[in-house]
Amino acid sequence: MAKKGKKIVAAQQKVDADRKYDISEGIDTALQARFAGFDESVDIAVRLGVDPRHADQMVRGSVVLPHGTGKEIKILVFAKGEKEKEALDAGADFVGNDELIEDIKNGWFGFDKAVATPDMMGAVGKIGKLLGPRGLMPNAKTGTVTFDVARAVNDLKAGKIDFRVDKAGIVHAPLGKASFGTEKLQDNMLALLRMLVAMKPATSKGAYMRSLAVSTSMGAGVRLDPLLVKDAVK
């Protein structure tokens, strides 16, 4: 087994694996435990008390992070007529209809998010097998199938993220960049957690937020105290 580098060991020693932190101290600890030489992303994993095998316990949605994600994204909008101009005026990077669909069929995926007007979904659905696995399929539940394309583009540019519980009942989401600092990352985390609480399924029993961990891209996971988090999101 390969030995861990000194930087990795030193970083891991800054995290008390037996402790559960409050939000602010947890984020601060994760930032202190960095060792990579770049501005790492900061992410959170939240294990929910849901069984995603049941449709009524599938937690899926979106939220606009108040300080954004720190990542510049390219947005594609499937639209026709006046909605094309509306999307361009809002700052969309690629706007069109049939020609964009053909480009995607030919293997082009030079965008990070896709929005579609409802009248385009019949055509867009035909490339669903190409978009879906890449997380690029527009979806009404996340606000990316809409005639209000300007708002959809503005929200995405402002830092809107999508989240979805996985098969293990865990939601993984980005909170921003390490350079944001503890305060901004905490604001972003609270926005996400409050949305998760608001979306709690009526059929979910017992504790809802079972466990939480925050980490940088390369750093060690820092566990948060679910009870302290629950108090913070009220």
Curated annotation (Swiss-Prot):
One of its GO terms (cellular component) is cytosolic large ribosomal subunit. GO terms for biological process: regulation of translation; translation. Gene3D superfamilies: 3.30.190.20, 3.40.50.790. GO terms for molecular function: rRNA binding; structural constituent of ribosome; tRNA binding. Pfam families: Ribosomal_L1. CDD domains: Ribosomal_L1 (cd00403). Keywords: Repressor, Ribonucleoprotein, Ribosomal protein, RNA-binding, rRNA-binding, Translation regulation, tRNA-binding. Belongs to the universal ribosomal protein uL1 family. Part of the 50S ribosomal subunit. Binds directly to 23S rRNA. The L1 stalk is quite mobile in the ribosome, and is involved in E site tRNA release. This is Large ribosomal subunit protein uL1. It comes from Desulfosudis oleivorans (strain DSM 6200 / JCM 39069 / Hxd3). The gene is rplA.
